[in-house]
C-alpha cells in the first residue's frame, strides 16, 4: 500500500509542517502523519503568531525559506508591533490570525508539494532495529518503513 519513505514526520503542527515541507522540497519521499487532517497547523485558543520569543523564531524560519510567516501574512486579522515603548531591539511583531483559514492554507500548500504525502493516523510505536529507528507502527496497524539507504541531495 505504501512505499518506503525517506523521511516520516509525525505531527502536523507548525514544526512538523515546516519539516515535512523542507524535506519534500529537497527531494526526499516524505510522509507527514497527523491525527487529524482537518487540524493541520492548528493554533491554540489564542491564535497569535509572533510575540517576543515566537516572533524571533518565525523570522528565522522565514529567513531559511519557511512558510509560517507567509501563511500568517495571508491569514492575518490584526497586526501589532509589541514593546514599542522600548528600544527597537525589543520590538516584536505579533499577528492575530484566523485559526480556521490558517490551517486550511497550510493544508492546501502542503498538498501541492511533490514528494509529500499526508496521512491521517496515530503513531503508537516505533520500529527499531539494532538501535536505529526504521519506521513507525500506526493505530490502524500499518507498519510504515523508512528507506535507510536513501541519499538526499
Which residues are covered by each model-predicted region?
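Beta1/beta-strand and adjacent pyrophosphate-binding region of the FAD-binding site
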Residues: 2-15
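Core beta-strand elements of the Rossmann-like FAD/NAD(P) dinucleotide-binding domain
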Residues: 3-5, 140-153
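Structured core elements
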Residues: 8-9, 31-32, 137
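Conserved N-terminal/central alpha/beta ligand/cofactor-binding core
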Residues: 21-132
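Conserved beta-strand-loop-beta-strand element in the redox core of flavoprotein oxidoreductases
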Residues: 127-147
